[in-house]
């Protein structure tokens, strides 16, 4: 290993350590534990910070109270909407920032670790929620689990970007979106002027 390879590895270690700690914490999240319940003040604040940070300060937070409404909102989400485009721009920016710190291989390995650590506990807890809500459609269950994996990926990109002291992770929309999962919710998405939250 030459000097430049050692330098590159040294630059990657702090970000990889953050990703590892984050990955271990994912197993303790109460995935989908509060679906359909009234919002706590913390969850309401996270929802507001998410919509504000994404550029939709006028979006109303709509708490979906049953699985059918959540599934319908998820299935009819406009993937070319202004909210989707705003998230994609943020994701692209964060990925670029991450690649300033990590090699493509290191980022890929870290993201694979995150996905592995989210998918199983989220799937298990979605099975419990599905039993409670009497949901048999596996495709609908997978929508929620996929959203959890995506939110964890987005939050991990924020963690890597925060290695740069000039980047503020406080109140970043992806951080707030992930916090909603930490509150046991499923942020289904913004459609028109409504943020659907189950």
Regions found by a protein language model. Give the residues of each.
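Short, glycine-biased loop/turn motifs at secondary-structure junctions and
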Residues: 1-198
């Amino acid at each position: 290993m030459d000097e430049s390879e050692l330098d590159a590895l040294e630059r990657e270690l702090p970000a990889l350590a953050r990703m590892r700690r984050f990955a271990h914490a994912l197993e303790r999240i109460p995935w989908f534990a509060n679906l359909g319940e009234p919002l706590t003040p913390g969850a309401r604040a996270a929802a507001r910070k998410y919509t504000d940070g994404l550029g939709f300060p006028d979006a109303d937070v709509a708490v979906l109270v049953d699985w059918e409404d959540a599934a319908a909102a998820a299935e009819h989400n406009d993937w070319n909407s202004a909210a989707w485009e705003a998230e994609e721009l943020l994701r692209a920016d964060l990925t670029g920032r991450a690649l300033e710190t990590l090699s493509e291989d290191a980022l890929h390995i870290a993201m694979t670790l995150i996905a592995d650590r989210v998918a199983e506990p989220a799937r298990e807890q979605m099975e419990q929620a599905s039993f409670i809500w009497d949901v048999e459609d596996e495709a609908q269950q997978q929508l929620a689990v996929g959203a959890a994996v995506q939110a964890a990926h987005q939050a991990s990109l924020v963690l890597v970007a925060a290695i740069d002291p000039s980047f503020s992770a406080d109140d970043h929309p992806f951080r707030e979106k992930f916090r909603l999962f930490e509150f046991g919710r499923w942020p289904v998405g913004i459609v028109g002027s409504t943020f659907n939250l189950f």
